[in-house]
Amino acid sequence: MKKIVLSCLLAGSLGFSLPALAQGDYPTLSQLNQRLQTLGNQASVELKSLTKTAGGKDIWVLKVGTGNLDEKPAIAVVGGVEGFHVLSVELATQFAEKLVSEHAEKLENTTFYIFPNMSPDAYEQYHAALKYERRGNATAVDHDRDGTAGDNGYTDLNGDGFITWMRVEDPMGDYKLSEEDGRVLVKADRSKGEAGNYLVFKESKDEDQDGKFAEDLKEGIAFNKSMTFKFPVFEPLAGDIPVSQVESRAMLDYLFEQWNIFAFVTFSPANNLSSPLKYNAQNARKRVVTSILQKDEAINAMVSGMYNETISQKAYQQTNQGTDGDFFQWAYFHFGRLSFGTPGYWTPDFKGKDNPEANYLAWADSLGWNEVFVPWTEITHPDFPGKKVEVGGIKPFVMVNPPFEKVGEIAEEHTEFILKLAEMQPKLEIQNLEVESIGNGLTRISLDLFNNSPLPTHSEMGERSRWLRKIRIDLNAPNDRLISGEKIQLVDSIDAFGKTSLSWIIRGKGDISMKAGASHVGFINKTFNL
């Protein structure tokens, strides 16, 4: 209770209130923008709109820190990579608010880049009159390549304001009722001799009469399906080329100029924090690497352990460790940074039900959540004359986004995790310094440049990347005084709690200075009195 009261006092002193205590549902874009503008008024925060989407929505970034922000190691926190994952936007935004109001001391050593919502066009569907789990932006796209954009999307057949499912009784169907819960449909296992009873489609009509349903949605390109790593060519929502949208291009252009980022935390369906990625030697040796590298696997496992110690919810059915064209994998494979992803929330294991939907419904029933399921109701469907068609199923959003009153605790735990990760950032120190006269007016300077951190200065993937700078050591000595050693030295990487040894021989008296580091590990300066 004391912690909550203190948090409220701190937040109030900065001009904003903690949203988890102030409202009953996820914010609208207007409410979110107001909170971001309030944050942008703080001295430690720079709020910038990178661009506007096809729907006219701002893509915001918050750069949070003090002093020389660009020469401190940084963490990038990303929300809204999937438009239907509204929780992710709130977690990123609340992290920014808590960072500024409750943890300002962390800004002395670390800079934070926070991208609260990369899919604002799709996010808006949560508050629209017709609710469905949208991924694409507002760009007009012909997903089925029939010459007309968005001509066969969803249809609210029962008029309840939600897009759920429709099932058609058909002895040649692929689906049957689940034995775990009769409200749920599962694919019949033909290898076990199971017969199907239903055809299953998203709630829609065959508007273009091509025999397909909801294959040309009235939405554009999905941010989280259009990155360069394993780009899913010719798939709906991906576009014709990677990074084709103004928001994805603007973000990547911005990131390529932020040399100090050492790690990403992305709130998305992909999860390598509950369970770390596994190294695959064959995939790691390919020309196009598709496996986490061996040293980075160990880092992922260590950070995953810290995450599981920090987060109270135990992992269940967290099998998504990246999908083609997603941002989480791009940040590692193509940008060379440590990349960590988590949805932040999932349905817990309940009553031993294997099917995710059956498990969710059993859990929801136990909590008295009666508004999460649309009962199957028969309708008349123009595309299935003479057949029994029913509409129903789990409502959109509820399986991936908890009730808003639970978000405060989730945000608190994930803020704690991100700040723990910041404490692990690479940290250069000078150890074993010796300045000794060796006669004839010469002085030898020797030292160890030590990385006092459980993380290496570079991920193994980052060592291969042109987008992660090497450690540079500059000795400010006149050429005629430097007898031995290099004025400029580059070091590929320093291991966790590792070192690199340096030595110079200098002629004469007078101060000599040294600067060592890189933007993503920070810089240290030292003056030697000779």
Language-model regions, residue ranges each:
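Short amphipathic, basic-aromatic surface patches that mediate peripheral association
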Residues: L449-R464
